[in-house]
Amino acid sequence: MAGPGSPRRASRGASALLAAALLYAALGDVVRSEQQIPLSVVKLWASAFGGEIKSIAAKYSGSQLLQKKYKEYEKDVAIEEIDGLQLVKKLAKNMEEMFHKKSEAVRRLVEAAEEAHLKHEFDADLQYEYFNAVLINERDKDGNFLELGKEFILAPNDHFNNLPVNISLSDVQVPTNMYNKDPAIVNGVYWSESLNKVFVDNFDRDPSLIWQYFGSAKGFFRQYPGIKWEPDENGVIAFDCRNRKWYIQAATSPKDVVILVDVSGSMKGLRLTIAKQTVSSILDTLGDDDFFNIIAYNEELHYVEPCLNGTLVQADRTNKEHFREHLDKLFAKGIGMLDIALNEAFNILSDFNHTGQGSICSQAIMLITDGAVDTYDTIFAKYNWPDRKVRIFTYLIGREAAFADNLKWMACANKGFFTQISTLADVQENVMEYLHVLSRPKVIDQEHDVVWTEAYIDSTLPQAQKLTDDQGPVLMTTVAMPVFSKQNETRSKGILLGVVGTDVPVKELLKTIPKYKLGIHGYAFAITNNGYILTHPELRLLYEEGKKRRKPNYSSVDLSEVEWEDRDDVLRNAMVNRKTGKFSMEVKKTVDKGKRVLVMTNDYYYTDIKGTPFSLGVALSRGHGKYFFRGNVTIEEGLHDLEHPDVSLADEWSYCNTDLHPEHRHLSQLEAIKLYLKGKEPLLQCDKELIQEVLFDAVVSAPIEAYWTSLALNKSENSDKGVEVAFLGTRTGLSRINLFVGAEQLTNQDFLKAGDKENIFNADHFPLWYRRAAEQIPGSFVYSIPFSTGPVNKSNVVTASTSIQLLDERKSPVVAAVGIQMKLEFFQRKFWTASRQCASLDGKCSISCDDETVNCYLIDNNGFILVSEDYTQTGDFFGEIEGAVMNKLLTMGSFKRITLYDYQAMCRANKESSDGAHGLLDPYNAFLSAVKWIMTELVLFLVEFNLCSWWHSDMTAKAQKLKQTLEPCDTEYPAFVSERTIKETTGNIACEDCSKSFVIQQIPSSNLFMVVVDSSCLCESVAPITMAPIEIRYNESLKCERLKAQKIRRRPESCHGFHPEENARECGGAPSLQAQTVLLLLPLLLMLFSR
C-alpha cells in the first residue's frame, strides 16, 4: 500500500524487475556504480518540510504565546536550586510520621486484645452466635437466616473502592478445614469481639486506614470493616491467616533452617508425595529474612540443589521456587541413614552461623520421615546440649506409629515439636505448629516488635481482588504486631494469641512526595532491609499473556535490577545500611514502552525512614531538573483562572489531603483547592506552596484558552481538520486541553484520558510528551507516533510537543510543555508535498521521492519511521527495513547503539511437567488429592479392598510432557539515539554486486531526519538490525555462583531465638481423625464427584 500522497503506481514493481534484469545482463560481472543522490536537493526538501510542520505545530500549540507570557513574569519569580539532601530528609520525616500513625493503630489493637483475653475464662460449652464472613446474610430454603449467618448490614463505601462493607462491625472468617463452632474458635471469637470499638476508633482517628484485622493462632480471622466473603471459582476459600507473611513475620524471629527429607525405599508412593508437599509448605512459611537448605537422605546425602552443598541460601521467592522445581526429581530407594543427615545438618548450621551471613537468630532442623530406629542422643549431646539452641521439628509421614516415640523424643529433647501427617489434608495444619513454638521466646520476653512486610499484592482475600486502581492490583505493605497471653500461669509456655495488622497501600507513600519538587525526570523510591523495592517507578508488577498477570518474583525485585548502571551497588548498599548521603551516575532511562532511551546524569540522595526497615531515595536529573522557581499572583487572580473549563490537575498528586475526613473523599483535587482557597472547608489540609504555584501557572497560561478558541472559530484555519488537539502541561501538574474537532471525531480517543498513563501527570512521572520535549533544544519540537501494545502498530496520529523555559540558560527550569496531536495522514501529506520541490528553474527536478530508484523515509531521533512509501512500515524501526543503511549510520557515528538490560523480563521456557506430581504442590489440587485419599481409606476400612493404588494412579501416572511457560529472566536489548551534532551526511555502502548510496538530513527545529536511499541496490547480504530482546543465558557454573552470591542485607534489629525460662514440655503428639472432620469433608466429597 502506498503512503498518503505518494503517486507511485502499482506497476512499478514489475517495471523495476525488468529494468534490473536488463541492466544486470549488460554489466555482467561488473559492479554497478551507485546512484548519486544530491545532498542539496534533500536539504531543500528537509528545510521545506521542517518550516511547514514547525509553523503548524507552533501555531496550533500556542507555544510562542506561552513562552512570551512566562517571559513577562521573568522579573517576578525567584529561582532556587533544590537541596536534594534536605528534600530527602524532609520526605523521610513525612513518611515516618505516616508510618507511625499506622503502627500506633496496631499497638492499640494489641493492648485491647491482650486485655480482653486476660479477662476471659475459657468455657468449653460456650454458645455464641458470631458473624461468620462466609455465612452472613445467607438464608435457608424457608427464608430463615442460617446459623452464624445473621443479618449483617453492608453498604458500598468509596474509601474501599465502593465495596459493600460495614464500618461499625468486624466479621470472622474460619478456614474451610476448621469447624466453625469448635470451642477454641468460639471462645477466641467471643473475647476478640472487644476489638470492634478499637477498629472503629482507629478509623475515626485516621480515616486513611484501610483493612484492620486480627489473625488468631487458632485459625480464625477477624476483619474490619466487615465484608462478605465469597468462595473462588472452585467453591473454596483457601485463606488461612496463619500462613500469611505478615502473620509469620510478626509471630517469629528470623531463622536458619535445614530440612532433612527421608528418601529411603519405605517412602515410596504416597508417602513421598506427602513429604514433598510438607517441604513445600515449610518453604511457604519462610521469608526474606530466613535462610534454608534441603537435604534428601538414604544411605547417602543428596543436596536437592547440589550447587549449594554445605551452605544455606536466602529464602526469597526465586530461591524457594528453584528448590521446588528440584523436589520433583526426588525418588525413594535404599535405606535411611539418619545419623549422617543429622551430623551434616548440625555442621551446616554451625558453619553458616560463623560466617555472619545468616539470620544469627533462631536455628532449626526439620526432619520429614516415616520413622527413626534410634533417638540419636549422642549426636544431640555432641552438637546441641545443654543449651538446645537448635530446635528439632519432626514430621512422621504415614499412619504407622511404630517409630513415633523416637521421633517425639527427639523433638521434645530439643525444644521442638512432633506431628504425624497421615494424609495430604493434614500437611498445612501440622506444618504451622512449628511457628508457634518458635514464637515462645518472643512471647516470654513480651517484646511487641513492629514488623513491616515487603511490598505485595494480596489476591487471596476476595475483597483484595476487587481493591484495585486504574493500573491494576494495589501494591501494599502490612504493619503487624504479635498478641501475647499475659496470664501468669501460662507465661513460661509462651502462648501466642495471634497477630494484629493493617494494610498500607504503597500509593499512600507517594502522596507524601511533592512531585513538583523532583523535576521532570526526578522520582522517589524506597527499599527494604534486603534491598528489595518497596516503590520505584521502574517496578513492573504485571506481564501480559492473554490477560494481565502478576510476575512471580514481583515482591523481591532488587534495587540493583532497576538502577542497574550502579554495577558496584554503591547506592544500594548505602541505603541498605541506612546511611544518609549522595551518589551520582549516568543513567539510561527508557520511556515509551522501553523503545526509547534518555541518557542523563542523576544525583541520588538517600536516608533511612526511622521506625521502619525501609530507606528512602530521591533521584534528581542534572541541569533543569535541579532547579525550581517560585512565582506569585493573588488568590483572586488565580481562582478566577482556575474556574476555566479547560483546566485540570493531576489527580494522583496531593495538592490537598482528601482522605482525612470522609466528607472530602468525593472531591477531586481541583475541587478541593477551590474550596480551600475560598475558605469553605477549614478542615482541608493542603500544600500551600504547591497551590501558590498552581495559581501562578493558571494565571500565566490563561490567555492560551482564548488563543485556541479563536483558532477553532476561524473557519479558514485547519479546514481539513488535520490538527485535532492542542494541550499544555505545567510543572505543577496543571493541564489545559483544546479540541479542534468534535470529541467523537478524534482519531485517538484515549489520548490524555485517565487510562492513558504515559501521557498524563501521575504519581510516578510527568507525561511522555513533556519529558521528551524537555530533552530537546529549546524552541524545537519533538514528533512521535504512539506505539501500539499489539503486534501491529495501528497508530494514526502524530504528537508534537515543545518545552517552555523561563530563562535562556542551562539552569532555567522547564516550566511547561505544549503540543498538538494531528492525523498521521495529514502529517505525511505535508512530507510528500515538500519532497516534490526543487531549485531548478525549468521545474524539472534531478531526483524525486516519486522516482523508482529511491526510497524516502522520515525517521525520528530513535530510528523509528514516521513516513515511508510503504504505509505499513510506519512505526517500525528503520534498521529492520534498511539494515545496511542503519549499520552504516552507526559506523559513521550519526546514530549510536545503547545496550540496555531488563532484569524483570519474562521469557518463554519449555518445562517438562507431570500434571500429577507438580499439581500436588498446588494447594487446591493437594486438597482434592487429600479428599480422594481419605475416601480411599474409608473404603479400605469398609470393604478391606485396596483401592488406593487404583485411585491414586490418575494423579501420578500421567505422562511427562513439555509445557511452554513464561518465566522470569534477564534480557539484553539495544536502543538507538541520533548524534545531535551531525546535521547531515552522505554515505556509500559496498554490497556484494552493487554500491548503495544514501543521504540523511536533519529536519530543522525537530527530532526528525529525512533519509533518501538508493533502492536499486538491495544489499541483502547485510542483515536487518532489530531491537528484539535477547535472553541472557547463564551456564551452570555461573548459575551456581549467582545462587551462592548474597548481596549485602541488614538483619532485623530484634531477635528472640532463645529464652532460658521456656517450658518445652508441650512438644506435640499424634493426631487422630475426628468425626467432625469427616462431616466437614462430606460436602466437598460430593462436589468432587460431581466434577
Swiss-Prot record:
Residues bearing carbohydrate: 166, 309, 553, 632, 793
Modifications after synthesis and translation: N-glycosylated. May be proteolytically processed into subunits alpha-2-3 and delta-3 that are disulfide-linked. It is however unclear whether such cleavage really takes place in vivo and has a functional role.
Motif MIDAS-like motif in this chain: 262-266
PTM sites of type Phosphotyrosine: 924
CDD domains hit by this protein: PDC2_MCP_like, vWA_VGCC_like
Annotated GO CC locations: GABA-ergic synapse; presynaptic active zone membrane; voltage-gated calcium channel complex
Gene Ontology biological process: cellular response to insulin-like growth factor stimulus; regulation of presynapse organization
Complex and partners: Dimer formed of alpha-2-2 and delta-2 chains; disulfide-linked. Voltage-dependent calcium channels are multisubunit complexes, consisting of alpha-1 (CACNA1), alpha-2 (CACNA2D), beta (CACNB) and delta (CACNA2D) subunits in a 1:1:1:1 ratio.
Protein name, UniProt field: Voltage-dependent calcium channel subunit alpha-2/delta-3
Taxonomic source organism: Homo sapiens (Human)
Gene: CACNA2D3
